[in-house]
Amino acid sequence: MEKYNVKEYIELLKQEDILKETIDCEKIMDKQVDLVSYNSKEVQENTLFVVKGALFKNEYLKEAIDNGVFVYVSENKFDVDIPCILVTDIRKALSCMSAMYFNYPGESLNVIGVGGTKGKSTTTYYIKAILDEYSKAMNKKDTAVISSIDTYDGVENFESHITTPESYDIHRHFANALKSGMENLVMEVSSQSLKIERVADVFFDIGIFTVTYCPLSRL
């Protein structure tokens, strides 16, 4: 997988018009980023860390630094002695940097998104079943799925606990599906995920909106 340096991530944030300021980054501009992460417990050497969440604490970042973080991206500066990249929208930053880190895998997949108040899961699995039958007949890999029921990408297969995962995890699943030789992926897209930029850098080949009228559905 192609790796990028700090300068290239900063340029990306500039292009997205969300870069606010860089602090003490001059000497690390050419340093390669081996991992982008938003989980302080899942970092390694040469990690660019994305600070998100209103409840994030300074000690979480210090723990991450001890484990290999050398620069962080945040909406606010923390009391730590490493370079930082300040942005105006951390969720958008996580989304675009995640897509770049995984080398935009969604662009090489046929991605189908299913949104709507009711029927997202049912519609998603109908589509997966149809595509799986086609793939079987053509001697191709089955269809990846991201849903509120479970997630399957050819590498990971687990029961889901959320309808649409964080943007970083979406692009990780895309990368896994591509690595596994899959061509198609169908996913549920919640209204919340649209609101908080989780799918901001997902380019859907097909978008489906389910409409089921029920006067009590929002009560």
Annotate each predicted stretch with a short phrase:
Residues 1-96, 100:
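N-terminal leader/targeting and accessory segments in enzymes
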Residues 94-219:
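Phosphate-binding loop of NTP-binding sites
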